[in-house]
Structures are given as structure tokens and as C-alpha cells.
Amino acid sequence: MALAHTLGFPRIGRDRELKKALEAYWKGELDQPGLLQVGRELRRQHWQLQKDAGIELLPVGDFAWYDQVLAHSLAFGVIPERFRPADGQPTLDTLFAMARGVAQGCCGGAHAQEMTKWFDTNYHYLVPEFTVDQAFSLSWTQLFEEVDEALALGHAVKPVLIGPLSYLWLGKAKGGEFDRLELLERLLPVYGEIFQGLAARGVEWVQIDEPILVLDLPQAWKNAFERAYNLIQREPLKKLVATYFGGLEDNLGLAAGLPVDGLHIDLVRAPGQYPTILDRLPAYKVLSLGLVNGRNVWRCDLEKALEVLAHAHERLGERLWVAPSCSLLHSPVDLCREDQLDEELQSWLAFAVQKCEEVAILARALVEPEAPEVRQAFEVSRRVEASRRRSTRIHKREVQARLAAVRPQDSRRASAFAERAVQQRARLELPAFPTTTIGSFPQTSAIRLARQSWKQGRLSQAEYTEAMHSEIRHAVQVQERLGLDVLVHGEAERNDMVEYFAEQLDGYAFTRFGWVQSYGSRCVKPAVIYGDLSRPRPMTVEWIRYAQSLTGKVMKGMLTGPVTMLMWSFPREDVSREVQARQLALALRDEVSDLEQAGIRIVQIDEAAFREGLPLRRADWPHYLEWATEAFRLCASGVRDETQIHTHMCYSEFNDVIESIAAMDADVITIETSRSDMELLEAFEAFAYPNEIGPGVYDIHSPRVPAVEDMVKLLSKAAERIPAARLWVNPDCGLKTRAWAETEAALANMVAAARQLRQANLA
């Protein structure tokens, strides 16, 4: 029989118990013993849930108080000087300080470590900071404590570690450039110490995650794998190297040949690496096949998965293991909690607990195909697949016909930017260095209470509309008083930049308990795309029309772009991401056109996740960038030349996608640049970016009110790179999370800075 195991399990709890406990601890409402008890109870529950589902070898070490990479940094003694305790011994509070920073009132203050996306998921990790003289030592023994807990409960365990090469790859050199591979020999002894500690506890297997094996690796890093694992093999324990999020491709031979006892591959993201892997795998080695999708919410097609397993079982026998494609960290916890989804839609879904059951039933089907539980599970799977194939809620002829009728000219504006710009300037009559904001204004407790009361039926539609109108009036009055040139309505009615639109589109569904961890205590509940997407009615027009009626100044319409809508949702698996993005683009195109018809002269289409969608392998970039830019243009190109299209992007690297950003052909792009001191504009200058740009002049993530002179300096730097006639003045990002007092003060200074620049340019 193939062994059923998982690579990791969600840590947040069915009711987000970890989130609630962490936030209570940070507020001083829960002491550390209470927090530790919550962690112990969650681990106990999660191990039992997996065991009850039929998982035979349970992961230990997948629990983390904030992030698994950060936990490794603490374990390895990779603690930046600004956080290092005087006695050298890190504590739980050290970990939280590294993740969240330390306030100025404590020890002079210390900024948090950088956070970035975990490969191409929507999870974020804390980036390790390495110095050229970096020392490593076993400094945090949480893994040993958790192994002891699991063993005491009678579980068969498989501790989980991030591998040494992936850990170094995920970090950054600080205090000067150097090759992180130079640190490898210093790091490996700590792994040896951990392996020895686990062996002493009677552990047989350890899982070593090396997800960078699915990336384009420099030759030096490939060579380092062989060097590192030749040393690691001398240590006790059987070792399973786990890869996920993509195919091994040119690294397949390297991974298969590593001197370890097993290899896990992701057959959801990269089914093509099977059966090739069988011919490269040594005869002694276990092969773990990831056949159940660990990062989406759909049921597995059991018959299709069993075909692969049965073939592998003939070749491998007991050397075959079955698992999800990756850690279940990226899946919600338990579908059984859902009580408001309709029966048919719920039958199509599987969360982490159900995915464990699928893994276990697949393993059992190899040896007991006629067992009643196996036959029943496969019968349900067949019914689900048939239901999804013929469902008219999924497959809508009118949506498919409209998509098929799209012509190349539908993704192009009528005229080139230079011609459009002349018409837009004549229509908008804006001054040089026009000022605006990115869209959202502070979401106060009163706004949240009104929305909650309306959704719960305690506030009528008319009462809710008046409450939102009051907030819009306030936002418009503040902007007019401050002297901003292009106004926004403030987005008071929006709970989330994706969910607000998804709730109004056909083809989206929403769960009550489909939470996944984004980072630390931050959890998100992505909408689920289950079918063809369309817009039954206008989504924003009445709010924006009302806002425009309050002022003679230009009011921007605000939309979330098709790529961002897709990337921040659980997508369908039966059609490509490209098709889903184009369906979203057509739905949003209708909204853009309706805004134009309502007299709105500027429409902003945010694409915050445009870069996040990039595939892990460079060879796959061109196809993604082609359809992602086409989706944006399809969404934005149905308007007249005099209507100005804006987009907003907030990330720190443009050089490698600048051509595609230009190909989007937005009239104005606003970007996050203040923290880089305008250095990000180098990419736009070098490329000779032809359209208009609004480089962010202050960091909205900080409560600090920027000085006028600081913003004047930044704008002057920007004007050295971009012609002044094409520069806009705006914050880095939306102001949803800020308070009104600091927002007004910062915007007043921003307007003053723009006026100074205008006077200087006229002089």
C-alpha cells in the first residue's frame, strides 16, 4: 500500500484561533502561557484531524507563530543586530519584534524585516537578513518541543524543515554585496545538529523542503545542491526532499539523483514530469506524488489521479507515497464548517481536511479498490465531475459567445497616446503636476459598523445609502478644502478591493470560513470563481455619479483590474487563467463604459497583482504577459480618446516587465516610489516610457506626516527622469488604513509641494 502523508497543514485553526490569540497577546490581553496553550491545542487538533482523515505520517514543524521562514531564522540564529537580545537567547518576543518591528519608545526602535510573497502564492514570508560574517547556531528549539508533543500523543511524525539551499536563496545580503552560497558550509552543521536531535527522539523520516528546485537556478546553485546533500547524507534519519509549485524540468536529474531517501514532486502544477521521473529515480528511493491540489478549493478527480497512481504503483510498490501537491497552508481548513453554500456548489469543493481524506482514499484504493468506503468516495467523485461538466451555472453560452466574438481592435484604443493626451488635456484642464490620491480614504469604525448592520439587516438599504453618501460628502469636502485637482469618492462602501466587485459578478461564490493565512495574524478569505463570469448590472456607477454631483472638479471612477481580481481569488481549474481574465475584462469593460456614459472623465483600473502573476520560470513569462496586458487593454479600450484611463501598481521592481507595462497603454500609471527615493523611475527613464506617471511622493504605510520639502525633493528628482508635463503628484497607495488627521495633514503638504513645483517651473 502507498503511504498517505501531507507536507503541511493550515495553522490558523478552524475559527482563526491563532489570529485571535496573537492579536490578544500583542494587545496585552493574553499572557504568554495562554498564547502557548492555544498553540499546543491547535497542533493537537490539527494532528488529530489529519490522522482521523487517514493520514499515516503527520507533519511536525509546519506550525509557526508568524511565518515558517522566520521560525527557521530564529532556529538558525539569523537574528539582525537590531533585534538581538542582550543575553543572545531569542524568545517569542524576539520573533514578533523581527516580524512587526519595535516602537520608537522601546530600545530606540527597530524596523521590521522585509516581507515578500512566498513563490507565486498569496502567502508572505519574512526575508532572512544575512551579513558577510554571518554565524549560525541552533538558537530556538520549538521543533524539538513540537516533536515531543506529537510523539507523546502517539503519532507517527515527519518533521518538516526548509532546506539549506532554499533558505539561503530566500534571504538577502545586508551590509554589502556577497554571494549567499558562501554561507552554506557554515549553515550545514546546524542542520546536522537538528537531525541528530530528531534521531535521538526516535524519528525515522524528515521532510526537507527545497522548492527552489522548480526555479531557473544558476549553475553555482545546482552544484551547491550536490555538495550540500553529500554532506547531509552522513547525518542520521531518512530524508524526503519536497519540491512544489512547479515542475523540476532541467533540475529533474539533479533532484532525482540527490543522495536522499525520497523525493516529492507536484503533479498538479506540473503533471508532465510523470512518468519521466521514473526513469531517473534510483531503485532505492521513495517517490511521493502530489496529486491533490494543495492550493485551491476544488475536489480532486479521484479516477484521474488513480490512473497515475496505479501506473506508479506497478513500478514502485511500497516506494510510492501519496500527498497533496504542496503544504495545505494555502487551503482553508474544513469545508464542514460551511453552512450557507448551496448543496451543489459545496459538493464541488474540498478544504484541507477533505483533501487529507482524498489523499488517504487514493492510497487505500490501490490495495482495497472494492472496500465500501473507497467505492463510495469514487462514486461521489464521478458524480461531482459529471455535475461540473454539464452545469449551466458554470458554462454560460452568452459569456462564451461574447468572448469568442472579441476582435483584435477591441483591445486597442482608437488613437495613440500622443493624440489622446491632447484631447484629455483640453477636456480636463488640469494644472502642471496635477494632484490626486490612489482611491481609498480612511475606513473608520463607523463605516465598518454601518456596512455590518446593513449586511445583517439591521440597517435598511435607504439608511445604508445615506450613511455612505454622508461619508462620500465628507471625502469630497476634505479634498476640495485641501485643493486636490482630481478627486475620488473614497470607497467607503467597499469592504475589499476584490470582494466588493466579486459579490456583484455572476460566476463568483463566497464562503463563510474559507480563511487562509496571508502572514502573521492576517488572514484573507478569497472569493471562489466557479463559473463563467459576467456583470448583471452596474457596480460602481451610482456611487461615483453621486460623488461627481457634489463637485465641479474631476472625479475618478475606481475599479479593480481583471488580473488582480483573478490572482486574489481561488480560480477555476477547468479553464485557463487567460480565459478567466478575459471574461473579467469584458465584465469590467462594461463598467468602464457605463462610467464614461455617466460623465466620468477619468477611470482608474488598479492592477496591484499584475507582477504577482508572473510564472516561476522565465520561459513562461512571455505568454503570461501577453494575455495579462491584453486583458487590461480589453477592459480599458472601449472608451473615447478624451476619457483618461489610469492604473495603479504597488511593487518594487519594474525593470523586467517595463515593456509589458507600456503595452498596457494606460494614459497614467501611479506607482509606489517614495521608499526607493524615486530610484524605481530609472526603469521608466531607461525605457523612455511614453505615457504619464504619478510616482508616489510619500509612504502611506507610515503614520509619519511627510514634510513639504521632502516631497519637493522627491518630485524634483522625478522631474530629472520624467518630463514635468507628464508627472502627476500622489501618495504611494490608498489611504484606507490611515486615520483622517494624518491623512489630511499629509495631503495638505503634498498639495503645497505640487504648488511649489509649479511656481518653480513657471519661474
Curated annotation (Swiss-Prot):
One of its GO terms (biological process) is methylation. Pathway: Amino-acid biosynthesis; L-methionine biosynthesis via de novo pathway; L-methionine from L-homocysteine (MetE route): step 1/1. The keyword Repressor does not apply. Its EC number is 2.1.1.14. L-homocysteine binds at I438, G439, S440, E491, D606. 5-methyltetrahydropteroyltri-L-glutamate binds at R16, E17, L18, K19, K117, R522, C523, W568, E612. Its cofactor is Zn(2+). The active site is at H701. Zn(2+) binds at H648, C650, E672, C733. Keywords: Amino-acid biosynthesis, Metal-binding, Methionine biosynthesis, Methyltransferase, Repeat, Transferase, Zinc. The keyword Methyltransferase applies. L-methionine binds at I438, G439, S440, E491, D606. It catalyses: 5-methyltetrahydropteroyltri-L-glutamate + L-homocysteine = tetrahydropteroyltri-L-glutamate + L-methionine. GO terms for molecular function: 5-methyltetrahydropteroyltriglutamate-homocysteine S-methyltransferase activity; zinc ion binding. Binds 1 zinc ion per subunit. NCBIfam families: met_syn_B12ind, PRK05222.1. Belongs to the vitamin-B12 independent methionine synthase family. Catalyzes the transfer of a methyl group from 5-methyltetrahydrofolate to homocysteine resulting in methionine formation. This is 5-methyltetrahydropteroyltriglutamate--homocysteine methyltransferase.
